Amino acid sequence: TVISIYSAAMLVYCTVNNLFITETNNRYSDINDITQYMLGHETNPSQVKVYTSFNDGAYLEFYGFKCYLDARMEIMLKSINQQNDIFNEYGKMRYYGNYKDVFDKYDFNYFLIEKNIKDYEYIKYDSKYELKHENNKYALFVKANVSE
């Protein structure tokens, strides 16, 4: 009957909608956790430089942090920004693992690293960086207070 079809359709809609909302909340819970940690330790986010990857910068920028990279390609190419080819630099860093050059060049305050990339394993054991906060997806590092 029409009522049975309508009821079944509503059940499917509510189930799918609930799954979408749950997935969306889970997707942002890890980056939000890191952001809240940083907000709890920084009084002026606009003065804080954060190394971020392609997919994470926009979230932190929303809260006022200065981020290395986000998904806006128009500002990542030297032909447009007239300063650095950030997107190419990022690609080389991810492929070759030369994170130290990029990290030193920009003098970041924080390094937001996804735990599923190879750079995480390098940085985790690099004595020049100290882990400050982590969750399932991200690790947040700062420069360690070590003499060279």
Protein language model features and the residues they cover:
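Generic structural signal of hydrophobic/aromatic residues within well-ordered alpha-helices
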Residues: 1, 12-15, 34, 86-90, ...
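Periplasmic/luminal catalytic loop of GT-C fold multi-pass membrane glycosyltransferases
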Residues: 81-140
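Membrane-embedded, lumen/periplasm-facing catalytic core of multi-pass transferases
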Residues: 18-54
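Extracytoplasmic/secreted envelope proteins and their assembly/folding machinery
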Residues: 31-35, 57, 100, 120
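Short beta-strand-to-coil "C-cap" segments at the C-terminal boundary of structured domains/repeats
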Residues: 141-147
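Short periplasmic/luminal acceptor-recognition loop of GT-C membrane glycosyltransferases, typified by
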Residues: 39-82, 108-116, 141
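Transmembrane alpha-helical segments
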Residues: 1-26
